[in-house]
Amino acid sequence: MQGEDARYLKRKVKGGNIDVHPSEKALIVHYEVEATILGEMGDPMLGERKECQKIIRLKSLNANTDITSLARKVVEECKLIHPSKLNEVEQLLYYLQNRRDSLSGKEKKEKSSKPKDPPPFEGMEIDEVANINDMDEYIELLYEDIPDKVRGSALILQLARNPDNLEELLLNETALGALARVLREDWKQSVELATNIIYIFFCFSSFSQFHGLITHYKIGALCMNIIDHELKRHELWQEELSKKKKAVDEDPENQTLRKDYEKTFKKYQGLVVKQEQLLRVALYLLLNLAEDTRTELKMRNKNIVHMLVKALDRDNFELLILVVSFLKKLSIFMENKNDMVEMDIVEKLVKMIPCEHEDLLNITLRLLLNLSFDTGLRNKMVQVGLLPKLTALLGNDNYKQIAMCVLYHISMDDRFKSMFAYTDCIPQLMKMLFECSDERIDLELISFCINLAANKRNVQLICEGNGLKMLMKRALKFKDPLLMKMIRNISQHDGPTKNLFIDYVGDLAAQISNDEEEEFVIECLGTLANLTIPDLDWELVLKEYKLVPYLKDKLKPGAAEDDLVLEVVIMIGTVSMDDSCAALLAKSGIIPALIELLNAQQEDDEFVCQIIYVFYQMVFHQATRDVIIKETQAPAYLIDLMHDKNNEIRKVCDNTLDIIAEYDEEWAKKIQSEKFRWHNSQWLEMVESRQMDESEQYLYGDDRIEPYIHEGDILERPDLFYNSDGLIASEGAISPDFFNDYHLQNGDVVGQHSFPGSLGMDGFGQPVGILGRPATAYGFRPDEPYYYGYGS
């Protein structure tokens, strides 16, 4: 059958269910439209059904509203609701009236993840109801004067706000072309007109498939020009207002000036309301278009970040939510973040924390979280006083998680760790730790606590009362490696807090076995290794918990993961401070095992440094010193490592070799010779080269070359030494013994005692002021001062 035979169209509307809107004060009316095409004889040719819905917004509904009257009015005005449903409407309205505004946490999260659509506003709300069939009339209005253009655009906007109409509007190229032209030509003539037309295109921008249409008409670029213009206008308004305010302040008795100022201020307020409606819809359109990163880059090149940061000075919550949401999206790219830094964004955001508007506070915290990945911006956050403000939010379940993440990032910087001691942060965190019912504590919470425990002042607060006891109890109960890592950080600080651990040495030592999880054992070992307490009987601990076989077994290459082996080495270094422990370890054959491990891990500076430190501890004790010097090749390894590129390794080597040299003359000579050779290597090479030049006739023989450099002991060659007047006479008037009165460290004369044998001894029989255990990748020693450069 041909199309022209279809002469008649029959439309039937059938009412359906009525529901309440999930988040707004509104009713949703469901209805069904059945369209049937009738033939010439009235018989149906083609039919289609479509389910639709209408939203009835009830702006005036509040606690004092007369529900019965409002229900009657709704039924009378909405033809889709049958009068028989009056009681149902009344019940729904009663429910809306009494429904709490606060949503559940999950709903809030979903709701705040995207700003709300712009509401109806002046110029958009007209009495006339738009009809899709009257589009030609509305298009004609766009060719008339400004008031008619505003009316025409408002009617088209009514249609565009219903997503069901968008596809039909998309096909109407005449309408879209006219709207784009009017916006381009007349946006400066009327804010209402510009707002209406941008809102129409915003409706299209809510759906990704229509973004090509907006790009085609270059609406995005036009919106950016409009936003830039409006922001500059706002600055001019503020300047004018400021001048008039200043005039009033200078002459408070002048009523004419005061009235003029009040009139200007009232006008300014009206203009700002309309302007913010325009800014909001234009920015929302751009935010939707920014789904495409290429489009976002174009916006960035047109200074979108500067515009958005300027808009942060506004007071309109809905506009601010949109602006901050946009900035949050942009902040994930470094270039945009750098633009935000230039505009001092942190200073502008700090005024929003805290604020009454939950959604704004939530999205602002999320933006700050993105920005807090930048070290300079974290510094700025502390400078502007965000630390106590964020700490105060830890008590609010809605913001606790995000605030904690920002604070965690701030706590990563050692400069700011101590500042947490002057806030209410630590008591709140301890409360959260102890109230946590799960076996594993939230990762954000425990990570934050681990960072804070790296600072001595914070640790004093953590250990107040039964703090440490409660932490130990929980860590041992649940075998939590992260909580034990926090305890390990606590244990590294010298002073009263370290002595608290004496009560838990047995509990910790009992965890050192192959039966426990390796991660947990690593942290327990690390905690024990930090306990450099003179009164602690390490020999008793090693024997009672049978730790020596465990430690020796783990030293075998490949016996365990490197992290665990390293902790074992550090633990051996700690217990080796005790004379009886060092002897116990030497008897067990741990020293050869350490040398074997040193060979296997010679490329790993951290392993090398910690193993050398064990040797350093052991050479203080007679039993282990003799084993190291006479039965192992440890001194030879130390000589090889004397000039390692790692400063920490060199330092430990020097100190260890100095002690070996004091107790063994043969090694003393080798060590001193090597130090001299290294320190003067450049000069020795030059002398050797000169001697070679003078002795070219002996080039193929060793007679003249041998005595100079290659074979003899350098310290037996006084003819190569300098004195204050130049080279010492070659006849050897000064004996090498002259140099035995000086302590050479890396070749530098540092004193007139050979080696530090006369230094005072501490509780372990060690010289006072000797070097401490070298830092590991785990962290710095607690008593090591920090020096930081404060960048601009």
Swiss-Prot record:
Cellular component, GO, one term: glutamatergic synapse
GO molecular function: intraciliary transport particle B binding; kinesin binding; protein phosphatase binding
Keyword terms of this UniProt record: Phosphoprotein, Repeat
InterPro entries: ARM-like (IPR011989), ARM-type_fold (IPR016024), Armadillo (IPR000225), KAP3 (IPR008658)
Pfam families referenced in this protein's UniProt entry, alphabetically: KAP
Region (Disordered): 103-124
Function: Involved in tethering the chromosomes to the spindle pole and in chromosome movement. Binds to the tail domain of the KIF3A/KIF3B heterodimer to form a heterotrimeric KIF3 complex and may regulate the membrane binding of this complex.
Binding partners and assembly: Heterotrimer of KIFAP3, KIF3A and KIF3B. Interacts with RAP1GDS1/SMG GDS. Interacts with SMC3 subunit of the cohesin complex.
Residues in ARM repeats: 333-373, 374-412, 494-533, 578-620, 621-662
Superkingdom per UniProt: Eukaryota
Composition bias, Basic and acidic residues: 103-119
Modification type Phosphoserine: residues: 60
SMART domains with a match to the protein in the record: ARM, KAP
Any one GO biological process: anterograde dendritic transport of neurotransmitter receptor complex
Organism: Homo sapiens
Name under which the protein is recorded: Kinesin-associated protein 3
